[in-house]
């Protein structure tokens, strides 16, 4: 994947974010965040008080109130800046996608065949159901399905991957995306969407959508923050009559400062940025999420359904063993197998040549120099091989070789039958080698389990996530692969109906399920799963059923998707813990300063030894604003992620962000107080 990654603080993005932060000062924009709306209203109130003091309408220190007002405005601006910066990064990613969209003409066919008469029309006029012909060098004008032809397609503008891919009619590789380019040959495509509804349009709208819908957890946290704000608002409101009854009423400016410092402004100011950044990180992994809800659900997933081929295994079978028939030595079998594979350019064929070379030092020979004739594999014969020096060597499936042997007057040995069954039972694919009518033995082709996958599954198990392998293999083969890969469970001989039933079973138990898919037959299960990652190379039906699309079409990406989702939830929880813990230090700073004149006993709470009541209040307000700026990188990048159990993760975050939230404000407020004193501003 070669898509350019944005630096955390691009100069252009910073300038745009500062401009947007000022624009977001409007009441309508602030109302969307109730906590920051209280800070905004407090800023307006203290500004009006400052003006009234300057004009002599009310008594009080205009300088002190003005400085408090200034830092309250900074608090609002910093929160706006965090959100604007996160949105700006997403919009920059969207702009790179917009560059893919090009105004072009399309050859709209009057009949669904490549030699039909065509009309040149603007691509914007194409409608769902239209048939178009696309040739080498053309931009594909719409999303659709290939109904005729095959071609090499450059999808780098969408996926960031420079290697071209093959798109052809039939099967699971018939889906094409508008904006990609044909490199060779031609395709006849049936458009599947109307203008403005293409995959690219939906990607751009999702990435740059300013009116982002809040996720359920985000809504729940917002309700908690509103409740805390109301509690602190009521508590602060009661302090004025309390102090007035004591004979020395606290000023409105001090009460406003106390309120702003006590309400959870840190997480309130960063909450939206965390959500936007989560979707941006997902896009950075080349995964398009249709909503923040999908990203959040990925963090809560506790069951992963993983296809065996391509996800758990490499997907290309490799020769792993030569098993000779009775009376045949292994070297003879290896030599015949290598000869039959010399001109076989498939991964399986090359692996047979290499295994024979490794086991018996059989050097690769040139077919032409041997004056041999290579017999290619066909769907009808299901065999391939070589004719050399009156020797007829073939390799192929068990059934094909049996028919070949019997047609040449031979018989298929019982011991080879047993070897074939043993190979299949161990999760490998048997290929039988024959010379003339004599069966020489079996080649075991094994789909290799990916390196390190067992350790990754162990990490997922620590986190409380169950892994389930999905395969069409028989139960014995599936069991062997499951044991080797270290998955928790498996579904053998899987059908679309069986996958759908399994997902519903887990969901009935209260679990959240994630899966990947690329075929039309995967669509029902993708639609049912809580996190459904469709492959970009898959069919249109699969992409529409999923709530995420992996542009790299890498099924293993599902594990990374879960990591990103969990990181977003951890970031939100960690900063919430830090924000609430902050209140303790601010309490020790402001309460003694506000009420020491009325109740001298409260001086005992001035554990930080702050210089004066005014410097204590101002230091707390300044710290409250600056901490938002210092935490913006953490909100955008996410907290450090480690694969731990829920309880271990909770303990770790309480130590780091809970204790940190208690200690950092004490240090920060004291440092600011000292600086104010040194500058003569205390």
From Swiss-Prot:
Binding site for Mg(2+): 518, 522
Chief location category: membrane
Record's keyword terms, sorted: ATP-binding, Cell inner membrane, Cell membrane, Ion transport, Magnesium, Membrane, Metal-binding, Nucleotide-binding, Phosphoprotein, Potassium, Potassium transport, Translocase, Transmembrane, Transmembrane helix, Transport
Coiled-coil regions listed in the entry: none
Record's subcellular location: Cell inner membrane
Membrane topology label: Multi-pass membrane protein
TM segment ranges: 34-54, 58-78, 219-239, 254-274, 588-608, 616-636, 662-682
Uppermost EC category: translocase
UniProt-listed Enzyme Commission number(s): 7.2.2.6
Active site per the UniProt annotation: 307
Residues where ATP binds: 344, 348, 377-384, 395
Family assignment from sequence similarity: Belongs to the cation transport ATPase (P-type) (TC 3.A.3) family. Type IA subfamily.
Record text on subunit structure and interactions: The system is composed of three essential subunits: KdpA, KdpB and KdpC.
Summary of the function given for this chain in its UniProt record: Part of the high-affinity ATP-driven potassium transport (or Kdp) system, which catalyzes the hydrolysis of ATP coupled with the electrogenic transport of potassium into the cytoplasm. This subunit is responsible for energy coupling to the transport system and for the release of the potassium ions to the cytoplasm.
Protein name (record): Potassium-transporting ATPase ATP-binding subunit
Source organism of the structure: Salmonella choleraesuis (strain SC-B67)
Gene: kdpB
């Amino acid at each position: 994947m070669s898509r350019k990654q944005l630096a955390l603080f691009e100069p252009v993005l910073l300038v745009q974010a500062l401009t947007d932060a000022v624009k977001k000062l409007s009441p309508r924009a602030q109302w969307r965040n109730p906590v920051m709306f209280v800070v905004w209203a407090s800023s307006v109130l203290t500004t009006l008080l400052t003006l009234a003091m300057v004009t002599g309408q009310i008594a009080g220190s205009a300088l002190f109130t003005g400085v408090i007002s200034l830092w309250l405005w900074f608090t609002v601006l910093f929160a706006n800046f965090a959100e604007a910066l996160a949105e700006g990064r997403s919009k920059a990613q969207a702009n790179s996608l917009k560059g893919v969209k090009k105004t072009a003409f399309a050859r709209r066919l009057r009949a669904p065949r490549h030699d039909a008469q065509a009309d040149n029309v603007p691509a914007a006029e194409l409608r769902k159901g239209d048939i178009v012909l696309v040739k080498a060098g053309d931009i594909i004008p719409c999303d659709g399905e290939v109904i005729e032809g095959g071609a090499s397609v450059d999808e780098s503008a969408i996926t960031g991957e420079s290697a071209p891919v093959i798109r052809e009619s039939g099967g699971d590789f018939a889906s094409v995306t508008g904006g990609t380019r044909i490199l060779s040959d031609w395709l006849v495509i049936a458009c599947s969407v109307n203008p403005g509804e293409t995959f690219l349009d939906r990607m751009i709208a999702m990435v740059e959508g300013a009116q982002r819908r809040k996720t359920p957890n985000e809504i729940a946290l917002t309700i908690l923050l509103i409740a805390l704000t109301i509690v602190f608002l009521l508590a602060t409101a009661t302090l004025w009559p309390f102090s007035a009854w004591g004979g020395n009423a606290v000023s409105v400016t001090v009460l406003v400062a106390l309120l702003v410092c006590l309400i959870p402004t840190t997480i309130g100011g960063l909450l939206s940025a965390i959500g936007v950044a989560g979707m941006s990180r997902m896009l950075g992994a080349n995964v398009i999420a249709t909503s923040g809800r999908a990203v959040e659900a990925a963090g809560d997933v506790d069951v992963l359904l993983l296809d065996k081929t391509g996800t758990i295994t490499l997907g290309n079978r490799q020769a792993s063993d030569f098993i000779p028939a009775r009376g045949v030595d292994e070297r003879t079998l290896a030599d015949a197998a290598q000869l039959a594979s010399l001109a076989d350019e498939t991964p399986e064929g090359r692996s047979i040549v290499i295994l024979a070379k490794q086991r018996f030092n059989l050097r690769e020979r040139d077919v032409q120099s041997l004056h041999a004739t290579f017999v290619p594999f066909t769907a009808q014969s299901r065999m391939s091989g070589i004719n050399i020096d009156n020797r007829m060597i073939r390799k192929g499936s068990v059934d094909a070789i049996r028919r070949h042997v019997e047609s040449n007057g031979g018989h298929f040995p019982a011991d080879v039958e047993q070897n074939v069954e043993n190979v299949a039972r161990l999760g490998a694919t048997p290929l039988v080698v024959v010379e003339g009518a004599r069966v020489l033995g079996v080649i075991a082709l094994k789909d290799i389990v990916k390196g390190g996958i067992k350790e990754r599954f162990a990490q997922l198990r620590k986190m409380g996530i169950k892994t389930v392998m999905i395969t069409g293999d028989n139960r014995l083969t599936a069991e062997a692969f499951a044991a080797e890969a270290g998955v928790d469970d498996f579904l053998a001989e899987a059908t679309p109906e069986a996958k759908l039933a399994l997902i519903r079973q887990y969901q009935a138990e209260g679990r959240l399920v994630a899966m990947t898919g690329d075929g039309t037959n995967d669509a029902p299960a993708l639609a049912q799963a809580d996190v459904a990652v469709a492959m970009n190379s898959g069919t249109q039906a699969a992409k529409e059923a999923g709530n995420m699309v992996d542009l790299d079409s890498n099924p293993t990406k599902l594990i990374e998707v879960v990591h990103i989702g969990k990181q977003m939830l951890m970031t939100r929880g960690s900063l919430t813990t830090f924000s609430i813990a902050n209140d303790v230090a601010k309490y020790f700073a402001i309460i003694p300063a506000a009420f020491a004149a009325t109740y001298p006993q409260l001086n005992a709470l001035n554990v930080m030894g702050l210089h004066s009541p005014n410097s204590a209040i101002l230091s707390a307000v300044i710290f409250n604003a600056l901490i938002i700026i210092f935490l913006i990188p953490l909100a955008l990048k996410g907290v450090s992620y480690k694969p731990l159990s829920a309880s271990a993760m909770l303990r770790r975050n309480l130590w780091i962000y809970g204790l940190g939230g208690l200690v950092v404000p004490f240090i920060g407020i004291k440092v600011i107080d000292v600086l104010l004193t040194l500058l003569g501003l205390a």
